[in-house]
Amino acid sequence: MGFVKVVKNKAYFKRYQVKFRRRREGKTDYYARKRLVIQDKNKYNTPKYRMIVRVTNRDIICQIAYARIEGDMIVCAAYAHELPKYGVKVGLTNYAAAYCTGLLLARRLLNRFGMDKIYEGQVEVTGDEYNVESIDGQPGAFTCYLDAGLARTTTGNKVFGALKGAVDGGLSIPHSTKRFPGYDSESKEFNAEVHRKHIMGQNVADYMRYLMEEDEDAYKKQFSQYIKNNVTPDMMEEMYKKAHAAIRENPVYEKKPKREVKKKRWNRPKMSLAQKKDRVAQKKASFLRAQERAAES
């Protein structure tokens, strides 16, 4: 069949159906969402949990959510902007920060459900494949599925750094090593040491050393915050090791104290009846005084 021109007549516009709002805005892939959200029909009221990972310009957002008719319910959330509390003050959107955010999410969630002592996850970071398995006689491992949104799921994407952090933190998330840094698509082999380097920020440290030797100005420009916070390439691994330990020690979110706001009033408040009567009396007295002065003169 050849090219058929769409005739936009009255019937076309009468029967036109707009797409979902978030599809029109280019925010949600409903083809993927349908498959992530729909639960098995023999599980009835059991929610299907998703690990949502979104990378913005200055932050990494990790959430555990499940879908309801009214909208998605967020069970737990962790953000990269919380990492300065654990000793990571710079590079809050790199692969190592994504791993830390995923780890924080997992430990916080398990702590909330009282499962943090049962499922410790992988304490020693190796970068190798690790899967959480349910322990007999204990509650089953918390299972969820990665929701990468509209991100391109290429090998080495930061989304998978957050996933690895969550798995090492004790969550059961189906995955393979094919999308981790260190996987070679030609030889079909996975090098765990390369992945570990990314988790420990060694790829950034190597680039810092390279720039320091090759172009001092570019180094000062690109790593200005590292210089300001006295973070050198040799400190990187120790910094992330301490952060991982600190996250495991205390993953609980601390609520900020509510800021007292003093309300400002821009218009005059209404007067009470007594104030109005007093004002009238004052005006009367003022008027009478003026009359007396006029009579005297």
UniProtKB/Swiss-Prot annotation:
**What keywords are annotated for this sequence in UniProt?**
Acetylation, Cytoplasm, Isopeptide bond, Nucleus, Phosphoprotein, Ribonucleoprotein, Ribosomal protein, RNA-binding, rRNA-binding, Ubl conjugation
Q: Which parts of the sequence carry N-acetylglycine? A: 2
Main localization is: cytoplasm
Region spans: Disordered: 253-297
Residues with PTM N6-acetyllysine: 5, 48, 220
Crosslink Glycyl lysine isopeptide (Lys-Gly) (interchain with G-Cter in SUMO1): position given as: 220
The subcellular location is: Cytoplasm; Nucleus, Nucleolus
- Sites where Phosphoserine occurs are at 185, 272
- Which InterPro entries would you find in this protein's record? Rbsml_uL18_euk (IPR005485), Ribosomal_uL18_C_euk (IPR025607)
Q: List every position bearing Phosphothreonine.
A: 232
Give the GO cellular component terms, alphabetically.
cytoplasm; cytosolic large ribosomal subunit; nucleolus
| Numbered residues of crosslink Glycyl lysine isopeptide (Lys-Gly) (interchain with G-Cter in SUMO2) | 220
Q: Name one GO molecular function term.
A: structural constituent of ribosome
- Per the UniProt entry, what are the Gene Ontology biological process annotations, in alphabetical order? ribosomal large subunit assembly; translation
Give a Pfam family name. Ribosomal_L5e
- Basic residues: bias regions: 258-268
What assembly does the database describe for this protein?
Answer: Component of the large ribosomal subunit (LSU). Part of the 5S RNP complex, which is a LSU subcomplex composed of the 5S RNA, RPL5 and RPL11. Component of a hexameric 5S RNP precursor complex, composed of 5S RNA, RRS1, RPF2/BXDC1, RPL5, RPL11 and HEATR3; this complex acts as a precursor for ribosome assembly. Interacts with isoform 1 of NVL in an ATP-dependent manner. Interacts with RRP1B. Interacts with IPO5, IPO7 and KPNB1; these interactions may be involved in RPL5 nuclear import for the assembly of ribosomal subunits.
Q: Which family does it belong to?
A: Belongs to the universal ribosomal protein uL18 family.
- PANTHER family membership: LARGE RIBOSOMAL SUBUNIT PROTEIN UL18, RIBOSOMAL PROTEIN L5-RELATED
Known function: Component of the ribosome, a large ribonucleoprotein complex responsible for the synthesis of proteins in the cell. The small ribosomal subunit (SSU) binds messenger RNAs (mRNAs) and translates the encoded message by selecting cognate aminoacyl-transfer RNA (tRNA) molecules. The large subunit (LSU) contains the ribosomal catalytic site termed the peptidyl transferase center (PTC), which catalyzes the formation of peptide bonds, thereby polymerizing the amino acids delivered by tRNAs into a polypeptide chain.
Return the protein name: Large ribosomal subunit protein uL18
Question: What is the organism of origin for this protein?
Answer: Oryctolagus cuniculus
Q: What gene is this protein a product of?
A: RPL5
